[in-house]
Structure formats: structure tokens, C-alpha cells
């Protein structure tokens, strides 16, 4: 028993020593390779790629809202950034031209400094990611037929109670596929009214025949 425990302890000590040796070797390789450190620093922070991007010069509203936004955020710490922007936009519209003029002058000065510092600057707005469209699209003929079928099902819901109603529905589907969509409502309304009236309304002779065909019922 003691021999088994000693062998297990020895195996655990060997594994721990190998782990420490591997960590020391990997750290030495990491510090001795400057390109790997640069790759980690540049890829670790996603904003590094945007730091080289030249920012757009501020306009008059940006110059004015720079201090106002900080003031509103301190007064209302629970307010979201979108709500603060809406409030600042409303306050900017309420200012007069005389009140806006100093901020226009400051914006012109900042634009001149920006033009001297970056003479080749061109504003390139970031494009928004478009939603992916499905590759499978219905053809024009099938989509139009589908719209017609939905329209018919909405106007005239069928209940397949007998073979006559099934034949009527299939006959109307065949006519929908070859007819024009202008006179669909009138033709369907007339045909449905005709078939419903003929199926529900019968002659006295037909009713008498059905009644006489049924066997009499005698209670026991």
C-alpha cells in the first residue's frame, strides 16, 4: 500500500515539474520574440486599428455640446446617452443665431487647423452592415399565385364537408391560375353564392325521395 502511494506521489511530482518547465520555456520564448508581443498588443485591443483613423473636425454643435453633455450627465447620472443627445439637440434648436455664432467661429478655426494638419484628408463615412438576404426567392409566377390563394382563403374559407365542395374548390383554383386578378372577387362571389344556394336548396321531390328512402324507426 505504501509503495502505491509513493509511486503516485512520485508521478504527481514529475507532472508538476514538467508543467513548471513548460511554463518557464514558453515565457522565455514570449519575451525573446518582439513580434509576438506586438501582435498581442495590436490584436488584443480592438481600438488600436481605429487610433490611426483621422477623426472628423468638430462642427458648431459638437463644440457646443462638448461641455453641455458633461453638464447634463453630471446632473442626471441615470440618463442614457441617447436621451442626452435628444435633449442636447432640442436645446441647440432653441438657441438663437447670436448665441450659436461663437461656436460657429470656433468650429471654423478647428477646421482650418485640421486642414493644415491633414491636407489630404477626405471624409469617408463608415458603411452600416446590411442584413443578409436569403438566396432562395420565389419566382414571379408562383409568388403571384400564392398571393391569390391567400386572398381567396381569406375571403372564402372552405370546409370540406362533401365531394361537391372539394370539386368546387379545385375548380376555382384552376380558374385562379389562368384568370386575371381584376375580376377575381366578382367571379368568386357569384360562383360561391350559386353553389351554396344549389347545394342547400333542393326541390320537394328530392327531399321526399330522401325521406322515403330512410327506414321507419319503431321504438321497442
Swiss-Prot record:
InterPro entries membership: HMG_box_dom (IPR009071), HMG_box_dom_sf (IPR036910), SRY (IPR017253), SRY-related_HMG-box_TF-like (IPR050140)
GO cellular component, one term: nucleus
Keyword Nucleus: yes
Alphabetical UniProt keywords: Activator, Calmodulin-binding, Cytoplasm, Differentiation, DNA-binding, Nucleus, Sexual differentiation, Transcription, Transcription regulation
SUPFAM superfamilies in UniProt: HMG-box
Region Disordered: start-end pairs: 195-220
One Pfam family in the UniProt entry: HMG_box
A molecular function (GO) term: DNA-binding transcription activator activity, RNA polymerase II-specific
Keyword Repressor: no
Example GO BP: male sex determination
Subcellular location: Nucleus speckle; Cytoplasm; Nucleus
DNA-binding interval(s): 54-122
Xref: PANTHER family: SEX-DETERMINING REGION Y PROTEIN (PTHR10270:SF161), SOX TRANSCRIPTION FACTOR (PTHR10270)
Family (UniProt): Belongs to the SRY family.
Annotated function: Transcriptional regulator that controls a genetic switch in male development. It is necessary and sufficient for initiating male sex determination by directing the development of supporting cell precursors (pre-Sertoli cells) as Sertoli rather than granulosa cells. Involved in different aspects of gene regulation including promoter activation or repression. Binds to the DNA consensus sequence 5'-[AT]AACAA[AT]-3'. SRY HMG box recognizes DNA by partial intercalation in the minor groove and promotes DNA bending. Also involved in pre-mRNA splicing.
Quaternary state and interactors: Interacts with CALM, EP300, HDAC3, KPNB1, ZNF208 isoform KRAB-O, PARP1, SLC9A3R2 and WT1. The interaction with EP300 modulates its DNA-binding activity. The interaction with KPNB1 is sensitive to dissociation by Ran in the GTP-bound form. Interaction with PARP1 impaired its DNA-binding activity.
Name the record gives this protein: Sex-determining region Y protein
Amino acid at each position: 500500500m505504501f509503495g502505491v502511494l509513493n509511486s503516485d506521489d512520485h508521478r504527481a511530482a514529475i507532472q508538476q515539474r514538467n508543467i513548471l518547465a513548460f511554463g518557464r520555456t514558453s515565457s522565455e520564448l514570449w519575451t525573446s520574440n518582439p513580434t509576438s508581443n506586438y501582435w498581442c498588443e495590436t490584436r488584443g485591443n480592438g481600438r488600436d486599428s481605429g487610433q490611426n483613423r483621422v477623426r472628423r473636425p468638430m462642427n458648431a454643435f459638437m463644440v457646443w455640446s462638448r461641455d453641455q453633455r458633461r453638464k447634463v450627465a453630471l446632473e442626471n447620472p441615470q440618463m442614457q446617452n441617447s436621451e442626452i443627445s435628444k435633449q442636447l439637440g432640442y436645446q441647440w434648436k432653441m438657441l438663437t443665431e447670436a448665441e450659436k455664432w461663437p461656436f460657429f467661429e470656433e468650429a471654423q478655426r478647428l477646421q482650418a487647423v485640421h486642414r493644415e494638419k491633414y491636407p489630404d484628408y477626405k471624409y469617408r463615412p463608415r458603411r452600416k452592415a446590411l442584413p443578409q438576404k436569403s438566396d432562395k426567392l420565389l419566382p414571379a409566377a408562383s409568388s403571384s399565385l400564392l398571393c391569390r390563394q391567400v386572398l381567396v382563403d381569406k375571403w372564402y374559407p372552405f370546409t370540406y364537408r362533401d365531394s361537391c365542395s372539394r370539386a368546387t374548390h379545385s375548380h376555382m383554383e384552376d380558374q385562379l391560375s389562368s384568370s386575371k386578378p381584376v375580376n377575381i372577387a366578382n367571379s368568386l362571389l357569384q360562383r360561391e353564392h350559386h353553389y351554396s344556394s344549389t347545394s342547400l336548396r333542393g326541390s320537394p321531390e328530392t327531399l321526399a325521395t330522401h325521406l322515403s328512402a330512410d327506414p321507419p324507426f319503431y321504438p321497442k
